[in-house]
Amino acid sequence: MLHCQGCHLPEAAGFEGRVPPIKDFAGYFLHSQAGRDFLIRVPGVSRSALSDSEIAELMNWLLQTYSESQLPDRFEPFTEAEVASLRVDPEPDPAAARELILNNLADELPLLAAELTNNN
């Protein structure tokens, strides 16, 4: 968590309007392949000094610790190989990609749609 809390804070809450939360939110991204890829491609993850294995382990821990209720029923943990293949192509515009992914997911996930409405 040391590598994430500088922006997302120790309790994974983020900064409203500036840094998105991990807590009770990040698990939604795993409901689509684009969202899953995004979590590894964001610059803070893809450009981290952590190894591929460490990133996979950290992401799996973060998701299961801070956003378990939002994970898909058939959650598949990140693997070292998956992280290695995704982090070579960092997301150039994380804010735009995040908005697009969440808007697409909101059509399928009523709970996410309600959260997005309440937070906008």
What do the predicted segments below correspond to?
Residues A13-S48:
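Gly/Gly-Pro-rich "capping" loops immediately C-terminal to redox-active cysteine motifs
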Residues P10, F25, F38-V45, W61-T65, ...:
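Structured segments of extracytoplasmic/periplasmic soluble domains
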Residues A49-M59:
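Mature extracytoplasmic domains of secretory-pathway proteins
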Residues C7-L9, Y28, Q70-P72:
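A short, ordered amphipathic alpha-helix with a cationic face
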Residues M1-P10, L58, L62:
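The canonical Cys-X-X-Cys-His
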Residues H31-F38, E54-I55, T79-E82:
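Stable alpha-helical elements in mature extracytoplasmic
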Residues S53, Q64-N120:
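Flexible coil segments in periplasmic/lumen-exposed cytochrome c-class electron-transfer proteins
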